[in-house]
Amino acid sequence: MQHSKSYRKAAAAIDRSKLYTPAEAVKLAKETTSVKFDATVEVAMRLGVDPRKADQMVRGTVNLPHGTGKTARVIVFAAGAKAEEAVAAGADEVGTDELVARIQGGWLEFDAAIATPDQMAKIGRIARILGPRGLMPNPKTGTVTMNVAKAVSDIKGGKIAFRVDKHSNLHLIIGKASFSEAQLVDNYAAVLDEVLRAKPSAAKGKYLKKVTLTTTMGPGVPVDPNVVKNLQEGSAEG
């Protein structure tokens, strides 16, 4: 793969043999973004789990203190009073059978889906579409609920879901390059806290194997996975 001159210049600023503290990594990621738009900042984590085993699945949600920099488009499967609550809370689309039909027809212009429990049988018809994209409502992530208003406002406010993929990796957005270093470190700390909290008891050996911070089309910055406390100061205490 041929990288651009700006990418190669950015990559040269990163010492591949070093593990950076979160504060250092955020600073470098912001400095090495080479695109002309406001790049997305993402953290990738390699976990010491076998996701093929049910007792080693890692999933959960995290409330990013400063959001993702993007307002999520949220749809809600609900009827009656619950549908009205969802609309009032700011849901982008609300419906039942007609929403299912639109998705069956190929419409996927949303970032999160919420459902009341009574709608789950209908949503089963589109599980094959939503599941692989991480969009299937699930009680564990608070997206199958009677409290649709809270679920909508949480997601709009920066709550994101995470789930380990079949290669034992997690990918989470922690903001935009335009965020301050402190905001990105705060969001990273929130993500790290929830991922550590989600560690399965069946997981043996080193849990957090590798952490990399990247921006859109930018080089990866290796982060020390052992730095948990004092993130702003970059202390290596864990």
Curated annotation (Swiss-Prot):
GO biological process, one term: translation
InterPro entries: Ribosom_uL1_bac-type (IPR005878), Ribosomal_uL1 (IPR002143), Ribosomal_uL1-like (IPR023674), Ribosomal_uL1/biogenesis (IPR028364), Ribosomal_uL1_3-a/b-sand (IPR016095), Ribosomal_uL1_CS (IPR023673)
UniProt keyword annotations, A-Z: Repressor, Ribonucleoprotein, Ribosomal protein, RNA-binding, rRNA-binding, Translation regulation, tRNA-binding
One Pfam assignment: Ribosomal_L1
GO function terms (MF aspect): rRNA binding; structural constituent of ribosome; tRNA binding
CDD domains: Ribosomal_L1 (cd00403)
Any one of the GO CC terms: large ribosomal subunit
Family: Belongs to the universal ribosomal protein uL1 family.
Function: Binds directly to 23S rRNA. The L1 stalk is quite mobile in the ribosome, and is involved in E site tRNA release.
Oligomeric form and interacting partners: Part of the 50S ribosomal subunit.
NCBIfam families assigned: rplA_bact
Identification of the protein by name: Large ribosomal subunit protein uL1
Gene this chain is encoded by: rplA
